[in-house]
Amino acid sequence: VYPVRYSEPAADALSGYASGMPAPAFYRKLWQRLHEEGTDAAEAWDSVVLDTMVRCGRRLRAKGETISAYDERCALQQARGLAALRSKEAPGLYELQDGVLSAFVKGEASLAGCEPLRLLREINTGNRVGELCRGDLVPPLVQDFARQCRKYRLRQDSADRQEVTLEIFSKARHRAESRFLHQSVFLNCGYAKRDKGPDLLRGTGRNLIRERWACQWSAGVETALVEHAVWGSTMAEASAQLLRRRMAEAARAVDGARLLVQGFLMGLGDMADAMSHRLEELLLTDGEFSSLCGACAAISALDGWQEQYGERGGYNYPAL
C-alpha cells in the first residue's frame, strides 16, 4: 500500500468524493489565516470572503462580464447582512455564495447566466496538489515520473491543464520530452494527451512538424503509476517490460507492427531487433489480408520517418 497525493478538485465532496469537504480551497485559506497568520476568527472569515469576492470579480471582468467594484461592495454588504440575520459573527461560505448570486448575477439565474456561480465554485474548489511527508513510501516509478516532469518543466503542483508544444524534428530535447509523454500514454496513467502532430499509427498529420500535448495532473495519475510499478523502476523500463509482454501476447501482424511503432515513438530502440523477430513470426502465421496490409503500412511509415525523428540507421530490423 502506497500513499498518494490528492488534489483539491479530487478532495472536493461536490465532485463525488464522499469523504471530502466542500470548497477545499476556501477552507484552506481560512485555515492559513487562523493558524499561520494568527488572525482573529471573525476577521479571518470576513477577509477570506472579501478576497474571494474580489478575485471572482476580477476574473469575471477578464472574461468580459460587466462586474464593477460597486457590485463587489454590494455582494460583501449582502454577505455581512445575511450573517447578522443568521446570528453569525462573520459571513461564511453560504453567505459568500448568496452575496455573489445577489450582486454578480445579472438577470435570471439560468444556465446561461450562472457564470459567476460557476467561477466562484472553481475558485473555492482550488487547483493545488498536496505533498507527502519526507520518508514516505513512494515507488521508484513514481519518483522517476516526478523527476522527468521537473526536467521538462511539466507541472505537478497544480490540477490545471498545461499546453505543451514540441518541435520534435529540430530539437533533441523536445524529442526526448515527446518520448516521455508517449511512455506516459502507453502506461495509461491519464497524464498526457496528444492533440496535434504527426500520427504514425493512423497515418494522419504527416504534414505537421510540431506536436501539441495537453498535460493535467490528478490523483489518478499516481494511482496508475503505482499499479504499473511492478513493471520497472523507471518510465522507460516499465514501458519496455509492458511492451515486451504485449508483443508476446499479440495474435495479429497489425497489432505487432503497431506495437513496434509505439516502441519507436517511446525511444525504446534497444528492443527493436527482439520485437522484429516476434513480428516476423506474426507475419508468417497471420492469414488475414487486412491485418497484413495494416502491418506493412505501419512498417513502411516507420521506415520512412526514421530520418525525421533523428533515428536513421537505428531501426533497420534485420529480422524483417
Label each PLM-derived region with a short phrase.
Residues 1-32, 103, 107, 111:
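Catalytic or ion-translocation cores adjacent to nucleophile or general acid/base/metal-coordination motifs
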Residues 6, 26, 65, 82, ...:
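Aromatic-enriched hydrophobic runs in primary sequence
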Residues 83-88:
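AAA+ ATPase "lid" subdomain C-terminal helix
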